[in-house]
Amino acid sequence: MSRVIVKGLPIYLEEARLRAHFLKRLQQQGRGSEDQITDVKIVKDKSGNSRRFAFIGYRSEQDAFDAIEYFNGSFIDTARIEVAMAKSFADPRVPTPMREKRREALKRLREREDRILAEKRQKQTKPQHGIDAEISKNKQLQEFIETMNPKMAAAAANPMARAAEQPASANPLLSALHGAEDDEEVDMFQLSEQESDDEYTDLHQRPQSAEEDELEEPAVGQDLDAAPAPDAAEDGMATNQEVSDLEWLKNRRIRIRDGEDAEAAPAPQEQAAEEPAEQEVPQEDEVSAEEAALTKIRATGRLFLRNILYDATEEDFKQLFSPYGELEEVHVAVDTRTGQSKGFAYVLFKDPEHAANAYIELDKQIFQGRLLHILPADAKKTHRLDEFDLKNLPLKKQRELKRKATAAQQTFSWNSLFMNQDAVLSSVAAKLGMEKSQLIDPENSGSAVKQALAEAHVIGDVRKYFEARGVDLTQFEKFKKVTERDDRIILVKNFPHGTTREELAELFLPFGKIERLLMPPSGTIAIIQYRDVPAARGAFTKLSYKRFKEAILYLEKGPKDCFSREPRGDELLEGDAAPEDVKEIKKSVEDVMDADSKTPSSEATAIDGPTVSIFVKNLNFSTTSAQLAEKFKPFSGFVVAQVKTKPDPKNSDKKLSMGFGFIEFRTKEQAGAVIAAMDGAVIDGHKIQLKISHKQSSLPKTSKGSKKKISGKIIVKNLPFEATRKDVFELFSSFGQLKSVRVPKKFDKSARGFAFVEFLLPSEAENAMDQLQGVHLLGRRLVMQYAEQESDDVEEQISKMTMKMKKQAAVSKMGALRNSGKRKIDMSDDENDGLNGF
C-alpha cells in the first residue's frame, strides 16, 4: 500500500501546492525527485468545490509510511490535517456507496416485477380449445349463441374450425371468459345490468350515423381504418361548408387488399393498445459484470491494465504478476512518435486460470501509488497456422515456420559473438588485399589453422571496436547462465560480407526508431538498440531467419546492461560524426586536467592503500613504459605506467612488448576522467583503447589470502576428432612459446576430443585465452580453461598422493569384496546330492 489519504485540507488548497508540501519531506531525506510522488488528487464535488480531502500516491510503500508518520497531525496554513493509509475499493472495510445500494434495490425491484409478470402471463395463456370445450359441454349456451347469431350456427357445431376463423375477441362473452382468472368461477348467464340483448343482435350491423361512431365503440367486425379518428369531432370536417362531399368521401374511404376479409379486422384501438403491454417479453436475468469478466479472462488469459504510471516499465509488471503464474508476454503501449508510455499495458498468462486469479487479487489494488484498474482484454491477434494447415505444407516450409515462431525463445548461449565463417575469411582477405582462394589452400593441411587464426584476428578487432564504444563484453559471458535479456538490443549475425551500415538501417528502421547501431569495420556482426521495446520486439519477430541477400539472418536478444554509456558520435543513426583527430583529443585532455596537473608529482611519494588500474590496449610494440608514462603524467592522481613485455626467444637479453599495459591512479574518479579524455587517442601511430582493469593494484601483497597464481597450462575442450597435435601446435604457437602440447588418444589411436597446451609463461597463456575466445577449429568452437596447477608445496603434494593411494586401496577392497561373494557351482553335483536321500 503506497497511497495515503489526507483529510482536513483548506478548501482553497490546490494540487500543485499540496504536491510541493509533501515533497519537502523527500527533499529533507535527499530524495527530492518529483517522480517519487506518482499521483495527487483533491476530491471535488459536482460544482467543482473541494471536499477537503485528497489522495497522494507514492512510488514506494516506505515513503508512504514515512509521510504518514511525519505529516499526520501537522498543519497546512491554519488547517490541521489527518494523514492515513488509503483503502482500495476491494477492501471489505470500505462501506458500500449509495449508488451501489440504489443499483441493488433497482435490481431486486426488476426481478420482482418480472416474476409477477410471468405469473400473470401464465394464467392468461389458457388454450382456446379449453373455452370451446366448456361451450360444447353447456347445451343451453350453445342454443343461446345459435339463437342470437344464426349465421354462426354452422361454426358453433365445429368449435375448432370456428376458433380458427374468428378472433378471440370477436364475442364479448368469449373475451370475458378469456380474461377470467383460473381460480375464479365465471357464470355464463350472468350479464351486466348495463348490457342488453341489443348488443348481440347489432353485433354485425353497420353504424347508423357518424355521430354514433364517435360516441359508441366500433363493431367487432368493422375495420379499424373505417372507425372515425378520435379528433374527428374537433376538426369539424362534417360541418364545414367549404369541404365538398367528394373530399369528405375521400377522407372516409378505406382500402381493402385483395383476398382480405373486412370482418377479419384487428381488435379495437383500446384492445390494440393493451396488447403490447400483455405481450411484453421480460428481460433475461443479466449476468453480473464480474462473472462476465472472469469468463472472458478464462477464455483469453489476457489482462488490460489502466491507470498506470507513464514511466512504469515491463519489469515492474513482471514482478507484480509473476507470483500468480508463468507470464507469456508483458506489453506496455508506447507512442511511436514520442517514445512515451500511453498509460496502459497488457499482460498475457500462459495459463488463463492464473490470469483469473491475478484479476481477482489485484483489481482496484494500489500499485505505485495509483489504483490499478484491470479489465479483461481481447485475445491477441495471431497469424499462426494451426496444425491442420501446417500438415498441408511441405516439410521444409513447416520447419521454417516453426523455427521462426520459436525464435524469441531460442538463445545462442554457446557463442554470442558468432560470425559467419565465409564473412570472416572474406574480411581477412579484403584486409590483406588478396583473394579468398589464395588465403585458404585446399591442398594444405594447415588451412583449418589459418581459418581459425583469421577468425581470432577478426574477433579481436570486433572486441576492440565494441569496447571502444561502451559495450561491456563481460555481460555476454554472464548472460549465458542468466536468462535476463534486454528486449531493445538485438544482435544481428550471419549476414554476408560487404553489407553496409546503411543497408542494415534500411532493413530495421521500418519497425521503429533506432537509438544506436554498431557495426565493426570487418562487417561480420552488428548490434542494434531500439528506443522502444515494442519496436524491437516487432523487428525481432519479423526479421528472424529472414533471407537477406544470399544468407539468412540470425537474430539474438542482447544482455541487460550491455552498454556502459549513452550513444554518441558515429554510434547514432541520424548522422555519422566524423572521427576526431588527435589534436582535438589533446585539447579535451587539457580541459579535464586540474590546475595543478602540470606540476610533475614526486615519483618517490609512497602510495598507501589500493589504487585503480587502467588497462591499455593496442599499444605500438615500440612504445616503452617511459613513453607511456610521459603521456599520462599530466593527469592528477597518476601513480605509475607499465607496458607488459615478454622475453625475446631469439635474444634472451631483450624483451618484446606484448601490445598492452597498465596505468594506475589514486582514485576511481581520476581514472574515469582519464578514460573519458584519452580513450581513442593516438600514441606512436596506434589508437589506444582504455578501460578499468579488474586488477586493482600492482603493489605487492603480503596477505596470505592473495589471489591464486595463474597457471601456464590450458586444457582445450570440444576439440575436433580430426585435429592433430600439429594443428594444435600451429594454432597456439602464434601467441607465445610453447612448452608442451599433448593430445590424449584412445586405445584405437583416435583422439579423445581434448588437449593440453602448456606455455612457457603464464602471461602468454592468458593472452592466448583472450585472443582465441570464441574461435572455431574445423567447425567446432574451442572451449578453453586453465588446467589445475601443480603445487610447489611438498606437504600438499604428499597429501594429494596419500588421498590418491587411499582411493585406490578403497577401490581394490571393494572389488575384492564383490569377488568374494562369487563362486563356481556345479549344478550336476548339487542335483545328485539332493537325490541321495530317496
From Swiss-Prot:
**Key words, A-Z:** Nucleus, Repeat, Ribonucleoprotein, RNA-binding, rRNA processing
Q: Which GO terms describe its molecular function?
A: RNA binding; rRNA primary transcript binding
Domain of life, source organism: Eukaryota
Q: Where in the cell is it found?
A: Nucleus
- Positions of the region Disordered? 195-219, 225-244, 260-290, 813-838
One GO BP on record is: small-subunit processome assembly
- Give the RRM domain ranges: 2-88, 301-379, 488-560, 612-695, 712-789
Q: What is this protein called?
A: Multiple RNA-binding domain-containing protein 1
Q: What's the source species for this entry?
A: Eremothecium gossypii (strain ATCC 10895 / CBS 109.51 / FGSC 9923 / NRRL Y-1056) (Yeast)
Q: What is the lineage of its organism?
A: Eukaryota, Fungi, Dikarya, Ascomycota, Saccharomycotina
Tell me the name of the encoding gene. Answer: MRD1
